[in-house]
A protein has these predicted regions:
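N-terminal active-site segment of His-dependent metallophosphoesterases
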Residues: 1-59, 131, 135-144, 339, ...
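A conserved active-site cap/scaffold subdomain adjacent to cofactor or substrate pockets
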Residues: 180-239
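His/Asp/Glu-rich metal-coordinating catalytic cores
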Residues: 34, 46-194, 203
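Accessory, non-catalytic peripheral segments of nucleic-acid enzymes
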Residues: 217-347
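Active-site regions of enzymes building and remodeling cell-envelope glycoconjugates
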Residues: 97-99, 113, 191-195, 221, ...
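Domain-start "cap" segments at the beginnings of catalytic or binding domains
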Residues: 1-13, 102-105, 210, 219-229
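Conserved beta-strand elements of the Class I
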Residues: 1, 115-117, 213, 231
Length: 347
């Protein structure tokens, strides 16, 4: 079984435990004895609390109790120094049923029709490509199919590409590439590269296709959807449909207990006062956002096209955006932005 981007933190331990227990249940049902966590077991790069470390310890003990071996690859959130071979997962590398990946390793069993090469995270604009080349030179041979499991950003996975992302062509020696890091499932067109999705939803910006990838001995694989964790759903509604029927639907989802719902109500600015935001919240919406169909960009963000943005200015603009959109958890975005060097963007 492959799973990634579990992101345990002091604020989500019950969700993490439910996530892992579901994974263990699937392993028991299907007699799976090997689990690979492909990066970002942890959320905070700065430090881990005792509660977090004990929850991970209990997770690994529960796997051992069911005779399941766990391979942990370090993700970018699992390291303080992104180029280091060792991260937080290495705290657990002496557990008898645990292997922690330093740089890369290969998993292969006599009954498998493939070899699974697992790599820890290294910066896309740093040493990753060199390390991948070394893996390909050392481990690839003609006989089994060669699968790769990594935790990286690859060009073509997101709607807006980044210069920092890796080019897809460097993965051509591999028959199949499974990837963590970006949380939504997607296949890069024209390649064998597939983002398998995080093990559960973390916020409203992610879709509901989250869970686990089961690799069979013949090299085929199956996505198994997470059923136990909270779902984050965004409902876009015109103002005329934001009445009793919508409230009944919200009450049903609240009674189900598995959904947090953000309602985005679209209406002309003049009609916004007719939307009963309080009633929608009372009916079970976690958030209600009013979107004016004819709204203009706020003055605060309509800066000159030629304005220079350094890292401080970008962070301030991001925080303003989150306040405007009522986004509570800004820490992950700020963590990514903190890597931007303190220099102007543009020409």
């Amino acid at each position: 079984m492959l799973l990634n981007d579990i992101h345990i933190s002091k604020d989500n331990i019950p969700a993490f435990q439910a996530n892992w227990q579901e994974a263990m249940g699937i392993c028991r049902e299907r007699d799976i004895r090997e689990v690979v966590v492909g990066g970002d077991l942890f959320f905070s790069r700065a430090a881990q609390t005792l509660d977090v470390l004990l929850a991970v310890r209990d997770m690994l003990v529960s796997a051992a109790d069911h005779d399941i071996h766990v391979t942990l690859a370090e993700g970018n959130h699992d390291k303080v120094n992104q180029e280091s071979l060792r991260g937080y997962c290495h705290v657990f590398d002496r557990h008898p049923n645990v292997t922690v990946v330093d740089e890369y390793l290969t998993l292969c069993r006599p009954e498998w029709k493939f070899a699974l090469h697992v790599m820890s995270y290294f910066p896309e604009d740093g040493s990753f490509a060199e390390r991948l080349g070394r893996l390909a030179a050392e481990a690839l041979s003609g006989k089994p199919e060669h699968f790769l499991y990594i935790h990286e950003g690859i060009n073509g996975a997101l709607a807006q590409p980044s210069e920092k992302e890796l080019p897809a062509r460097i993965f051509s020696p591999f028959d199949k590439v499974f990837v963590g890091h970006y949380h939504n499932r997607t296949v890069i067109p024209g390649t064998g590269i597939e983002y398998i999705g995080s093990s559960r939803q973390h916020n409203f910006g992610e879709d509901e296709e989250k869970g686990y990838t089961v690799l069979y001995t013949d090299g085929t694989y199956e996505f198994v959807k997470n059923r136990v964790n909270m779902r984050y759903r965004v409902m876009d509604m015109p103002a005329e449909r934001a009445g009793l029927h919508l409230m009944d639907e919200l009450r049903e989802m609240e009674a189900d207990g598995r959904y947090k719902v953000k309602v985005r109500v679209h209406a002309p600015a003049a009609a916004m006062k007719s939307v009963d935001k309080a009633a929608l919240l009372e009916a079970g919406a976690a958030k209600v956002e009013l979107v004016a169909d004819d709204e203009q960009l706020p003055e605060a963000v309509s800066s000159s096209l030629f304005e220079k943005f350094d890292s401080r200015r970008i962070r301030e603009t991001y925080e303003d955006f989150c306040r405007e959109k009522q986004i509570e958890d800004v820490s992950m975005g700020l963590e990514y932005l903190s890597r931007i060097e303190n220099r102007s963007c543009g020409n």
